[in-house]
């Protein structure tokens, strides 16, 4: 027949809409026309496909060829369409008999020799194909990442000839081999941090409830050390979470996917990171740091050194767990549910009080003014990490609690949360907070009066309740008590610091 249809998938973030490759061969002047909003890289496929077909032992049709990539309103880029275009050409020119062609989808770039090359984002394309009941053929370069998907619906090929022989029933394509296991537990241990017991307690609460944490203190007190130990307190990703994170990572670094399997992402962008690098962007938007940190941790060291507009762009994703990127050519949603951990010095000189302070209150407030109030309001806990008192360093950290011990308490608290409300504390909405974070009447009145004195917002009220509920779970208490609220209020260092500076200015 002179018409052939082959199925493949486009690349729009982590979504993979179906693309139908239609090839029609008719009499007329020899030539190839490609329609359906193809980008330059797709238009270049005509030369790659021509050479691949000839070097695979077939002939390129010397007729009028029309190739349509439908639907036409979706932008299409990259070399992922080479393989389906080549197969459609061979079927339409009656060089390939493939009666079961519509049971498969194909993605892959072709070398001039006909060899298959991998493409970015194969995981999400394979998952979408499997959902509609079709098997998908990918290149050997993508074997490891699609091997993370359970089942035998993904088939691996190394050359155009192998795919053609498979469709004719002369060759069997195998699914990915080898079982991927979670990476080794080689996280840094919290016991390496000398002193800072309140900081370790805050880290335990953050790990149990999925809360956001701001660490403040002079240089060299252990803020970054504490933050880097958080992944060692968290459970590994579930299979569903791991696939979500792997699908995002495969868009930018496919070779790193299997090494990160079931490990919580830990992203630490430099303060010079641009808005595009942080949230994602491009003419067809690529994922940014907040999406690469999905289901994991985003650590921002030297927080005030980031551009203010970059930090304020995080406000919506922190609340919604996703980022919407709207560009002229494409509008894409990326998941971005992460824990935000930040560290900062309290002043431009590193200290804001005591004998080491070299900054005036005006200079310190100007420095903190780089952080907007709504952004600071997104932190559930803020804690000062002070210089260690005399005698702590000389003891050399003897008797410090290890991460393995703390992890047991964290896992138990998370299990209690999931059994009660089927989600982490940090993900509760306002309606669920009323149900799961109830207070006694006198405690509610006391908390409201306290927040009024501190000038805190309704969002701060809700975050305090969630932190107090996590503390109660860690203590194995059924209800939120006054001492849980008091401990939650003790983790509001940024509010106390701002009030102190404003008092000095008065």
Locate predicted features.
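Basic, amphipathic alpha-helical bundle interface domains used for macromolecular binding and assembly
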Residues: 35-46, 61, 68-78, 284-285, ...
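P-loop NTPase nucleotide-binding/switch module
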Residues: 168-205, 209, 237-290
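Walker A/P-loop
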Residues: 215-255, 320
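Walker B catalytic acidic pair
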Residues: 295, 301-303, 313
């Amino acid at each position: 027949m002179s018409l052939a249809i082959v199925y493949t998938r486009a690349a729009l973030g982590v979504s993979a809409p179906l693309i139908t490759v239609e090839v029609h061969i008719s009499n007329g002047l020899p030539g190839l026309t490609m329609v359906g909003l193809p980008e330059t890289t797709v238009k270049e496929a005509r030369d790659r496909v021509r050479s691949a077909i000839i070097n695979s032992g077939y002939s390129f049709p010397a007729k009028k060829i029309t190739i349509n990539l439908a639907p036409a309103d979706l932008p299409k880029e990259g070399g992922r369409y080479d393989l389906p275009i080549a197969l459609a050409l061979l079927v339409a020119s009656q060089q390939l008999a493939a009666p079961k062609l519509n049971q498969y989808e194909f993605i892959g770039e072709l070398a001039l020799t006909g060899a298959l090359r991998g493409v970015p984002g194969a995981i999400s394309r394979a998952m979408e194909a499997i959902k509609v009941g079709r098997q998908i053929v990918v290149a050997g370069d993508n074997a490891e990442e699609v091997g993370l998907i359970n089942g035998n619906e993904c088939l691996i090929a190394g050359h155009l000839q192998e795919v053609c022989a498979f469709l004719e029933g002369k060759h069997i394509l195998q699914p990915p081999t080898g079982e991927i296991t979670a990476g080794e537990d080689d996280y840094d241990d919290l016991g390496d941090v000398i002193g800072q017991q309140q900081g370790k307690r805050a880290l335990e609460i953050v790990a149990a409830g999925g809360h956001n944490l701001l660490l403040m203190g002079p240089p060299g007190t252990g803020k970054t050390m504490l933050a880097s130990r958080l992944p060692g307190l968290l459970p590994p990703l579930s299979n569903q979470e791991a696939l979500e994170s792997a699908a995002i990572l495969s868009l930018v670094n496919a070779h790193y996917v299997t090494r990160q399997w079931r490990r919580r992402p830990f992203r630490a962008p430099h303060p010079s990171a641009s808005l595009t690098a942080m949230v994602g962007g491009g003419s067809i938007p690529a994922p940014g740091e907040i999406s690469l940190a999905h289901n994991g941790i985003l650590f921002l060291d030297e927080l005030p050194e980031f551009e203010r507009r970059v930090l304020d762009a995080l406000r919506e994703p922190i609340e919604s767990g996703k980022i919407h990127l709207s560009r002229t050519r494409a509008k894409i949603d990326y998941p971005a549910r992460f824990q935000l951990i930040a560290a900062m010095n309290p002043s431009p000189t590193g200290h804001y009080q005591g004998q080491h302070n070299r900054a005036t209150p005006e200079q310190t407030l100007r420095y903190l003014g780089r952080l907007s109030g709504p952004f600071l309001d997104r932190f559930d806990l803020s804690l000062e990490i002070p210089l260690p008192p005399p005698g702590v360093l000389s003891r050399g950290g003897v008797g410090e609690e290890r991460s393995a011990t703390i992890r047991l308490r964290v896992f138990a608290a998370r299990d209690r949360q999931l059994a009660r409300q089927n989600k982490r504390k940090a993900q509760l909405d306002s309606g669920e907070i009323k149900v799961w974070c109830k207070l006694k009447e006198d405690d509610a009145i006391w908390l409201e009066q306290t927040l009024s004195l501190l000038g805190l917002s309704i969002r701060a009220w809700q975050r305090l309740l969630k932190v107090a509920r996590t503390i109660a779970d860690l203590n194995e208490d059924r209800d939120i008590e006054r001492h849980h609220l008091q401990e939650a209020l003790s983790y509001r260092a940024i509010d106390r610091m701002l009030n102190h500076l404003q008092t000095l200015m008065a």
